[in-house]
Amino acid sequence: MIKTDICDLLQIEYPIFQGGMAWLGTAELASAVSEAGGLGIIGAGHMPPDIFRNEIHKVKERTNKPFGCNIMLMSPFVKEVMQVVVEERVPVITTGAGNPGVYIPALKEIGTKVIPVVASVLLAKRLLRGGIDAIIAEGTESGGHVGDITTMALLPQVVDAVDVPVIAAGGIADGRGVAAAFALGAHAVQMGTRFVLSEECIAHENYKNAVLKAKDRSTVMTGLTTGHPVRIIENQLAHKYKNLEFSGGSKEELENLGAGTLRKAAIEGDVKEGSVMIGQIAGMLHDVKPCKEIITDIMTEAETVIKNLQTFGK
């Protein structure tokens, strides 16, 4: 069995994180991943604090294993949500869209592990000074909000730049990807798109079918001119957004067009006018399975790949 420093740090069986996806990173999915030995993560997104607290309670009812919460630091509820994290003594948080430094002292006091997501070496170095426990290097292959550096290029540079464990994210969905991430210095991997296609994910059937039908070139980047690019499946919404974006649309117009579109796709099932946030790896996914099977299959394959690689030098 593959064990890494991350497994010891977080007391998890397998070095696999489930991405904290807004609307889809629910208690049902997070608890299933944690029960299967990985780190399940509630995607707080823009959840009001009372709903967020309820999701935490539901996870605790379903599993006694470690879990995490992904906190978007630009959320209008971030202060209240962080207070809930402290009050509920959440074991792990991952963070995005900002610097968690101001919250770290209170989190350290209760033993919460803080793991920010970064898309550049510069940001990794900056956040390291705040006392983080590990860091997620997320490549542009990921779905949703992303940077512009690939995982293959970003990961080893972040590994070389920091002295905490690094988790690889972006473009990973099977044991081959896990083995490759380890070869580049990662101590764990984070996967979002693969867990969208799990039985426990609440994504609408249309959303899952859109992922299943996706090919290698099915996703596009929107918001490139705004400084906040988002990877989604190319559909009517993507075309409207890019047309508005590159014809001089204002920031307000773009925000209005994008507002509520993730829920429209993920929960309501409108995959034409909604935002289907998935990664480029979707083209190699062809089935929906329980989280436990996903994790055990991936780790078994990773062990086989690593073993087979050892024969190359003989």
Give the residues covered by each predicted segment.
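Conserved active-site-proximal phosphate/metal-binding subdomains
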Residues: 153-167, 173-314
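Active-site entrance/lid segments in N-terminal catalytic domains of soluble metabolic enzymes
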Residues: 1-161, 165
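Glycine-rich phosphate-binding active-site loops on the catalytic face of alpha/beta enzymes
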Residues: 22-23, 38-49, 136-148, 172-207
